[in-house]
UniProtKB/Swiss-Prot annotation:
One of its GO terms (molecular function) is ATP binding. CDD domains: F1-ATPase_delta. Its main location: membrane. This is ATP synthase epsilon chain. Produces ATP from ADP in the presence of a proton gradient across the membrane. It comes from Maricaulis maris (strain MCS10). Keywords: ATP synthesis, Cell inner membrane, Cell membrane, CF(1), Hydrogen ion transport, Ion transport, Membrane, Transport. Belongs to the ATPase epsilon chain family. InterPro entries: ATP_synth_F1_dsu/esu, ATP_synth_F1_dsu/esu_N, ATPsynth_dsu/esu_N. PANTHER family: ATP SYNTHASE DELTA/EPSILON CHAIN, ATP SYNTHASE EPSILON CHAIN, CHLOROPLASTIC.
Length: 133
């Protein structure tokens, strides 16, 4: 049997995935990176985007937002503030949420409200880009 990478994907609500896979591609703050079995240890902040889990020739994509990735001798762990399977993204609801968030930026009464709304706009735009591909 070929080497496998142990991978854990954890959100605040629950563990979303735990198992052995061939490879995981992660949207790191400095760019996407791939993790294979026996990868050198490191940590990275993750940016909003899709992780791609590759196992036995099949790819599974999950949108993640916020958090970090840690590669150790034991494998890869991603602690994500939010995670949703790309196949489960409701693009119509997402378009409405994005429109509402953009309106909230315009209607914000102070800088804090504007920053919060702008952060939502950025998240929804990233989610929309992932869902489109």
């Amino acid at each position: 049997m070929a080497d496998k990478l142990h991978f854990d994907l954890v959100s605040p609500e629950r563990r979303l995935f735990a198992g052995n896979v061939d490879q995981v591609v992660v949207p790191g703050e400095e760019g996407d990176f791939g993790v294979l079995p026996n990868h050198a240890p490191f940590m990275s902040v993750i940016r909003p985007g899709a992780i791609t889990v590759i196992d036995d020739g099949k790819e599974t994509r999950t949108f993640i937002h916020g958090g970090f990735a840690e590669v150790t001798a034991a494998g890869l762990t991603i602690l994500a503030e939010e995670a949703i399977a790309v196949a489960d993204i409701d693009t119509e609801k997402l378009a409405r949420d994005l429109s509402d968030a953009r309106e909230d930026v315009t209607a914000a009464k102070d800088e804090e409200e504007r920053d919060q709304a702008a952060a939502l706009v950025a998240k929804y735009e990233a989610m929309q880009a992932v869902a489109a591909h």
